[in-house]
């Protein structure tokens, strides 16, 4: 099966992007200056990522709110139209996190549900199952991923540089969602991101994506790829599906119980998750820091007193801190300051538990 292409694929290739497969898409890993330079540009300036591989399921209709309440872990009553919310879709049987999702509540009866790259069909299927289980309920849930590009502008200078392109886009506050217009194109802009920095994500029609990209980069915003996005999200302590979330991993194990609201009523997987809450988790996600430039790596064993007690889910060298950082599943009694060892290809790295984020 051929990987899908971003509406900006030709633009990326024309400026020297290194293209890699990711979640069924061909996407830029980095550009000519490389991942390290792009990472630093985001921490100290502003970058733009093409994140068009994020799915968009547009859910509309008078029953849309009720269906999403039954589908996802968080409580939409806590926000309102014009706001965004982080949430999870769980497996019905074991409460594993099928996907972690941002919902943009665009209008009173319009929601853009934003799954990860490869999970759009699973999310759509789950919504269909929930509609079938609810009497007299109808919604319209359409995959509009291919109709638009999504550009994430992130960094401490993101808003100041964005304001030279469009002041309205630059003014969308954190976790706000607004419909805007740019050069005749209808946009949806949200104050969301995945870097630990301030910024916005812009959904733009595919027909106008290249023009908006050019306007942003001409304003001094640096193109950045998936490599920098991963090191940035790790420094920020943010989970990545397939690493810190996925099959066999629950919201509670991942330390994301704040995105779960048991008091709102039943949701998909709520019984299984409540049972885990009541009996106690068997492991928990924690941050680890190491000395030196050698980074911990995904899959590395974590040892305490010579005994394997956990596993690294994501690890890398932190450009900002100058040493290794990792997220790992550890015993539930692990506390900040506890000492462990990480086995990296036969070499043991001393590691200390910290509370993420590592930076910021």
Residue ranges and their predicted role:
Residues 38, 94-95, 242, 260:
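Alpha-helix boundary/capping detector
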Residues 65-69, 86, 100, 110, ...:
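Generic internal hydrophobic packing segments that stabilize the cores of diverse globular domains
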Residues 70, 78-80, 89-96, 101-107, ...:
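Short, charge-rich binding segments
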Residues 80-97, 170-183:
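Conserved alpha/beta core surface patches that mediate binding of polyanionic ligands
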Residues 50, 100, 201:
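Acidic active-site catalytic centers that drive phospho-/nucleotidyl reactions
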Residues 1-23, 27-31, 106-360:
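Conserved, structured C-terminal
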Residues 1-89, 96, 227:
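Acidic, proline/glycine-enriched N-terminal capping motif
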């Amino acid at each position: 099966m051929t990987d899908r292409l971003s509406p900006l694929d030709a633009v990326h290739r024309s400026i020297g992007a290194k293209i890699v497969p990711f979640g069924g898409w061909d996407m830029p890993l980095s550009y000519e200056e490389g991942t390290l330079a792009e990472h630093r540009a985001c921490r100290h300036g502003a970058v733009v990522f093409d994140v068009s591989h994020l799915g968009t399921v547009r859910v509309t209709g008078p029953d849309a709110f009720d269906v999403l309440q039954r589908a996802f872990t968080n409580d939409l009553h806590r926000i309102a139209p014009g706001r965004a919310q982080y949430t999870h879709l769980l497996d019905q049987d074991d409460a594993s996190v099928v996907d972690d999702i941002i919902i943009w509540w665009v209008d009173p009866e319009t929601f853009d549900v934003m799954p990860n790259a490869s999970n759009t069909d699973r999310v759509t299927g789950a919504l269909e199952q929930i509609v079938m289980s609810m009497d007299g309920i109808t919604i319209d849930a359409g995959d509009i991923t291919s109709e638009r590009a999504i550009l994430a502008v992130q960094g401490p200078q993101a808003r100041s540089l964005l304001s030279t392109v469009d002041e309205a886009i630059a003014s969308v506050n954190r976790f706000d969602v607004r419909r805007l217009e740019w050069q005749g194109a209808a946009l949806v802009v949200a104050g969301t991101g995945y870097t630990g920095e301030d910024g916005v994500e812009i959904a733009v029609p595919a027909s106008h994506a290249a023009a908006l990209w050019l306007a942003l980069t001409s304003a001094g915003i640096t193109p950045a790829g998936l490599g920098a996005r991963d090191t940035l999200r790790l420094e920020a302590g943010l989970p990545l599906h397939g690493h810190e979330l996925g099959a066999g991993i629950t919201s509670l194990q991942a330390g994301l119980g704040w995105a779960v609201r048991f008091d709102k009523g039943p949701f998909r997987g709520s019984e299984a998750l409540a049972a885990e809450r009541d009996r106690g988790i068997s492991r928990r996600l924690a941050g680890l820091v190491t000395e030196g430039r050698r980074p911990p790596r995904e899959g590395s064993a974590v040892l305490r007193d010579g005994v394997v007690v956990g596993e690294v889910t994501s690890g890398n060298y932190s450009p900002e801190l100058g040493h290794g950082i990792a997220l790992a599943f550890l015993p539930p009694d692990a506390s900040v300051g506890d000492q462990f060892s990480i086995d990296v290809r036969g070499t043991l790295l001393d590691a200390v538990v910290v509370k993420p984020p590592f930076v910021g």
